[in-house]
Regions:
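Feature recognizes metal-dependent phosphohydrolase scaffolds
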Residues: 1-119
Length: 119
């Protein structure tokens, strides 16, 4: 499908409607690392300390909008125990045998359940 692909990997006001849709899907579902200029990188899925050269995790980006807002997100199961202000990763690899995680907004803490083994 034309909806999937690695390009465009950088926003431009000159993108076609199809390219805008593809970029948006990639930014919301696949973005993990980006360059200072906003270029997205899709190959690496490891933890933030294993970032590709010249790329940073999107939530550590120096120009990140809404830095003072709490951001809860998933779809990055290799991300472990991030200690970054207002950043709350919720995907802790349940499907890979780790744990299912939620965040208690009232008490401000994570709640986790170890993945069950099904035979």
């Amino acid at each position: 499908s034309k909806m999937y692909g690695n390009y465009p990997n950088k926003w431009s006001n000159d993108l076609s409607n199809e390219e805008i849709s593809r970029y948006t899907i990639n930014a919301l579902m696949r973005m993990r690392f980006c360059k200072e200029d906003g270029e997205l990188e899709f190959e690496h899925k490891l933890n933030v300390d294993q970032n590709p050269k010249n790329y940073e995790a999107w939530f550590l980006h120096s120009n990140r909008l809404m830095a003072d807002e709490k951001i809860f997100f998933g779809h990055w199961s290799s991300l472990k125990d991030i200690n970054s202000k207002n950043i709350y990763p919720l995907d802790h690899g349940c499907v890979w045998g780790d744990r299912l995680t939620a965040y208690d907004l009232e008490n401000h803490n994570y709640i986790s359940q170890k993945s069950l083994e099904i035979s």
